[in-house]
Amino acid sequence: MAKQATGTYSRITRHAATLLGKQIRIARKGRKMTTQDLSDRAGISRGLLQRIEKGNLKCQIGAVFEVATIVGLKLFDADESSMIARIKQADDKIALLPKHIHPSKKIVDDDF
């Protein structure tokens, strides 16, 4: 399986990952947690935590979200009950969408 190079991500994506990593580091230090404490609590390696805090885009999103939650960062600006309600709303919308998207066929006008 080919690995995606960081250079293929948009600038805003790279900035968002960097910002989230810095916010995680600030929250961790604010709670007086070492990288070892947080990585143990999240069930990840110290190296992975360090990559998350640097904004590495190759980190698993589940690990990033878990670390952010442990240090108290609020994800999606919602509490758990409203997040569950928003998931239900998204499921309802997805149910109304077509299961498959077929590209529209271009009709070539070759009548000169």
Where does each model-flagged region fall?
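A short, Lys/Arg-rich alpha-helix, primarily the initiator
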Residues: 2-29
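Residue-level signal for the short linker/turn that defines the boundary of a DNA-recognition helix
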Residues: 22, 32-33, 59
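Short polybasic/polar patches that bind polyanions
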Residues: 29, 40, 69
